[in-house]
């Protein structure tokens, strides 16, 4: 997957597409179909995963790959700090809509939409017994996970830490929020997302879905 990502970085073609959400045309960046199939397979792998939000499922898949590449073993003691800016917004919007329409909520509404369920489910999947931390600090959430893990490692309270972030914000409500803030990219721009263009004269935010995880540990 890393090779595919690097290949896309080198390509002059954008993966940003226009999709319709509740009748509104929005610019978004989605995960590849192959990864979508992996998420669907993960849902079926364990009956408990069926009700989880995509932020959790993507984080689990990314964590499995990171741990395998680092050579960590199932059951190893390591800390986990995976954050999310928007959290389980897909499930939250689904459950809220059901509540508005029926006046009732599903049993799993609370446990599957609380922010802490990302790191705890990763710990469950990897059978880790170390500390589990979740947080939300907007766009710098994943970076703060790295900073927090470094503090744990340097303090001697941990020797290994799994860190990162996961976002699945492509929902009508979340996209509408960004539009309301007037920070979203316009379709008539030549390059819609210009995050590193310090001379741009228009806002150029584009939401995407992704999970990124890294393994940090003390050196010898």
Give, region by region, the residue ranges found by the protein language model:
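ACP-dependent fatty acid/polyketide chain-elongation machinery
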Residues: 1-48, 219-220
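Short acidic, glycine/serine/threonine-rich loops at helix termini
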Residues: 2, 91-95, 172-177
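A short glycine/serine-rich beta->alpha loop
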Residues: 42-52, 107-108, 132-135, 198-204
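N-terminal amphipathic, basic-rich helices that act as targeting or association modules
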Residues: 49-65, 71-74
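Active-site-proximal alpha-helical scaffold in enzymes
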Residues: 59-69, 115-118, 123-126, 131-167, ...
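Short glycine-rich phosphate-binding loop at a beta-alpha junction
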Residues: 76-83
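Active-site-proximal gating segment of KS-fold condensing enzymes and close homologs
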Residues: 84-133, 180-181
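Glycine-/small-residue-rich "gating" segment that lines the acyl/pantetheine channel
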Residues: 104-106, 147, 151, 168-220
């Amino acid at each position: 997957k890393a090779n595919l990502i690097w290949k896309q970085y080198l390509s002059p073609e954008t993966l940003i597409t226009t999709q319709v959400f509740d009748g509104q045309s929005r610019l978004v960046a989605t995960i590849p179909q192959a990864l979508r199939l992996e998420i669907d397979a993960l849902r079926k792998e364990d009956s408990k995963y069926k009700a989880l939000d995509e932020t959790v499922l993507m984080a689990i898949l990314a964590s499995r790959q990171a741990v395998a590449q680092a050579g960590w073993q199932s059951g190893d003691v390591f800390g986990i700090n995976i954050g999310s800016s928007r959290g389980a917004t897909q499930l939250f919007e689904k459950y809220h809509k059901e509540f508005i329409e029926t006046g009732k909520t599903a049993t799993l509404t609370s446990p599957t939409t609380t922010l802490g369920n990302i790191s705890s489910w990763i710990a469950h999947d990897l059978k880790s017994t170390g500390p589990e931390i979740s947080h939300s600090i907007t766009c710098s959430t994943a970076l703060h996970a790295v900073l927090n893990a470094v503090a744990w490692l340097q303090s001697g309270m941990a020797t290994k830490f799994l860190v990162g972030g996961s976002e699945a914000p492509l929902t009508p409500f979340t996209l509408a929020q960004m539009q309301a803030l007037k920070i979203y990219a316009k379709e008539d721009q030549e390059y819609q997302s210009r995050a590193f263009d310090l001379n741009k004269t228009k806002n150029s935010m584009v939401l995407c879905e992704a999970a990124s995880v890294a393994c940090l540990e003390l050196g010898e």
